[in-house]
Amino acid sequence: MAISIAVETPLQDDVRALVARLNDHLLPLSPLEFQWKMTVEQMADSSTTLFVARDDTGAAVGMGALKVHSPELGEVKRMYTDVSVRGQRVGSALLSAIVDLARARGLSSLMLETGTGDGMAEAHRLYTRSGFTPRGPFLDYPDSQWSAFFELPLGVPTSRDNLSEISVD
């Protein structure tokens, strides 16, 4: 199955459905006060770029966003792949697209907050395989047992001709 990844607006019904599935997945993993959800409306803000993965039928099967906080700092947000494509490296391709865009924009660091526990083990493996290392809290995230924080120093920016469409076979 071929997967394509492109920058899209989050204000689409199938993307809203992905966000709902992500929220349902996260709900039992930590108390609500430690779930830092972005709504699709917040994801549509000009500081955020959303990548959507679609299968060969056009169905939205994954997403991940880059939120730019400053000229130096970006944050990975709302990473999710549908269970139907897990294990097919869709999450890795989404994360690579986010990292590439952060580098192209000249950011020096990419950080993320994710949950802890068994339900997040796959996510932690993805981030560490992609070069992210554990770190302490950043921005206004509190230090808690429910959060794990990761960082990827980006170094020298690279340029890519087309960051709006990426294919994964």
Model-found features: residue ranges?
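Conserved acetyl-CoA-binding loop-helix of GNAT-fold acetyltransferases
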Residues: 81, 87-101, 125-129
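Acetyl-CoA-dependent GNAT
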Residues: 3-77, 82, 95-96, 101, ...
